[in-house]
Structure formats: structure tokens, C-alpha cells
């Protein structure tokens, strides 16, 4: 459960991401594909090379979904229901991949905002991404 402090930390951190959200989403995806090559199996039709338009576009989708989630911290299941259905029933993404991408997103945010990435902010963002991952995998059952 996200505390009031967590919610404040998440909103403040995401405000700093701002216009860079799509760029950071793409960077986190590239980091995921490089660090965990098995994640590439879900994107056989993508050009996965550095800077590819397809990775940038999907990174923006990821970032937009997270921006939506940040705006609905009190109702993540409702805000992410359609994405949960898509990933569970159509795409059939292995749930572990959400954790891998979450880790890579935290690394990306820490690299770009080292002074703002305090232990408290790190913990809040980690809880947020874990909650988002749980919501996205809730329809798998």
C-alpha cells in the first residue's frame, strides 16, 4: 500500500521526469533488452537496435502508461485495467518481465536524477512500480 509520503515522492519524482518520460521509457527498454536478452522474444517484429524508432515509440507508451498511473495512485487497478487485459490475454507477457523493466527504469531515473534519487524516493518509486506490476499481472489468474 502506498503511503501519503510515497504518493508525494512519486508525484514529485515524476514531475521531474516531465517531458523526458518517453526518452527515459525508451532508455529503460533498451537497458532491459541489453541486460535481460530473453525479454526480446516479445518483440520479434521490432528493430531493437539503439535509438530505433520502434523502441522509442514503445518506450513512450510505457512512459505514458506510467504517467497515467501516477495520476491515478488511488485507483491503479481501474486506471490500468485495459493494459492488464492486453498483457495477460493478448500479449501473454511473462509477469517477471514487469519486474525486470521496473528495475531498469529505476536505474535510468537514478542515472538522470542522481541528486533527487534519495533512498526515500527510491523506496517509493520501487513500491509504485511493484504495485503497477502487480496490477498488470492481476488478470493472469
Swiss-Prot record:
Post-translational modification N6-acetyllysine, affected residues: 16
Modified residues (Phosphothreonine): 108, 134, 137
Pfam assignment, any one: Globin
Gene Ontology process terms (BP): hydrogen peroxide catabolic process
Gene3D superfamilies listed in its UniProt record: Globins
Entry-annotated residues carrying Phosphoserine: 3, 35, 49, 102, 124, 138
Gene Ontology cellular-component annotations: blood microparticle; haptoglobin-hemoglobin complex; hemoglobin complex
PTM annotation (N6-succinyllysine): residues: 7, 11, 16, 40
Tissue specificity as recorded in UniProt: Red blood cells.
Record-linked SUPFAM superfamilies: Globin-like
Database matches in CDD domains: Hb-alpha-like
Binding site for O2: 58
One Gene Ontology term of the molecular function aspect: oxygen carrier activity
Classification via InterPro entries: Globin, Globin-like_sf, Globin/Proto, Hemoglobin_a-typ, Hemoglobin_oxygen_transport, Hemoglobin_pi
Subunit structure as annotated in this protein's UniProt entry: Heterotetramer of two alpha chains and two beta chains.
Family: Belongs to the globin family.
Biological role: Involved in oxygen transport from the lung to the various peripheral tissues.
PANTHER family: HEMOGLOBIN FAMILY MEMBER (PTHR11442), HEMOGLOBIN SUBUNIT ALPHA (PTHR11442:SF48)
Protein name in UniProt: Hemoglobin subunit alpha
Organism, scientific name: Talpa europaea
Lineage of source species: Eukaryota, Metazoa, Chordata, Craniata, Vertebrata
Gene, per the UniProt record: HBA
Amino acid at each position: 500500500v502506498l503511503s501519503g509520503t510515497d504518493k508525494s515522492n512519486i508525484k514529485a519524482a515524476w514531475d521531474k521526469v516531465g517531458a523526458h518520460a518517453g526518452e527515459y521509457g525508451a532508455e529503460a527498454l533498451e537497458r532491459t533488452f541489453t541486460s535481460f536478452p530473453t525479454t526480446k522474444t516479445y518483440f520479434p517484429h521490432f528493430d531493437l537496435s539503439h535509438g530505433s524508432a520502434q523502441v522509442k515509440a514503445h518506450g513512450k507508451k510505457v512512459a505514458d502508461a506510467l504517467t497515467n498511473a501516477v495520476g491515478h495512485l488511488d485507483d491503479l487497478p481501474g486506471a490500468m485495467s485495459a493494459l492488464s487485459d492486453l498483457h495477460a490475454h493478448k500479449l501473454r507477457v511473462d509477469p517477471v518481465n514487469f519486474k525486470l523493466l521496473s528495475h531498469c527504469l529505476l536505474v535510468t531515473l537514478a542515472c538522470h536524477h542522481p541528486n533527487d534519487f534519495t533512498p526515500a524516493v527510491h523506496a517509493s518509486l520501487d513500491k509504485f512500480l511493484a504495485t503497477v506490476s502487480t496490477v498488470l499481472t492481476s488478470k493472469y489468474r
